[in-house]
Amino acid sequence: MRLGIYGGTFDPIHIGHLRMAVEVQEKFSLDKVVLIPCNTPPHKENGAAASARDRLAMVRMAVEGRAGLEASDMEISQGGPSYTVATLEALQSPDKELFFILGLDAFLEIHTWKEYERLFSLAHFIVLARPWQGDRAEMFHVEQYIRENLPGLAVPEPDQGYFRALHENKRIYFAQTTALDISATHIRKTVNQGKSIAFLAPESVEKYIKRQGLYL
């Protein structure tokens, strides 16, 4: 099984998250993309605005009825800070090929993550390129970053359009998805101002936010 792993705070989940997941699933022929809300984000000083329970509920609502997308509570049920290395380790299985999905900005800080060297032996990476730049431009940017911060972990394969990790034959791919200028921060501010978030988040999520009084 080709399994996409998409972690995040999802505070709240929105149409941008979902559209990206669908496009990555199709582009890389993934059997499934699992969206995993973190319990406590280790790289965010103020934590999440909504509780883990609420964020998980919203992710479950957002993917309900959508073939190929699934919500998981594995990081929330584990408790404590959510570390990607532990998540990918727990998902290892002979019948699974893991693809870890993350944005370029997150990738360019990966040398600050816990046991970051091990990540490249646990899963392929799918790095989401910025919408205003092409894959080739991003590859050049990432090549510089790897050379300076991750020496010995990956080498470029420019003719193939990816980097090859030097452990377990994993690869670092690049993908561009439809540019949707939507952010969870903007949604929280919009809710706080008493304005509508219709068509920014799934209707079920919008109703849940109102019902629970989130982000006020």
Curated annotation (Swiss-Prot):
Any one GO molecular-function label of the UniProt entry: nicotinate-nucleotide adenylyltransferase activity
Keyword Cell division: no
GO biological process: NAD biosynthetic process
Keyword Flavoprotein applies: no
EC supergroup of this enzyme: transferase
Catalytic activity: nicotinate beta-D-ribonucleotide + ATP + H(+) = deamido-NAD(+) + diphosphate
Matches recorded under Pfam families: CTP_transf_like
EC number: 2.7.7.18
Keywords associated with the record: ATP-binding, NAD, Nucleotide-binding, Nucleotidyltransferase, Pyridine nucleotide biosynthesis, Transferase
Pathway(s) where this gene product acts: Cofactor biosynthesis; NAD(+) biosynthesis; deamido-NAD(+) from nicotinate D-ribonucleotide: step 1/1
Classification via InterPro entries: Cyt_trans-like (IPR004821), NadD/NMNAT (IPR005248), Rossmann-like_a/b/a_fold (IPR014729)
Recorded family membership: Belongs to the NadD family.
Function: Catalyzes the reversible adenylation of nicotinate mononucleotide (NaMN) to nicotinic acid adenine dinucleotide (NaAD).
Record's protein name: Probable nicotinate-nucleotide adenylyltransferase
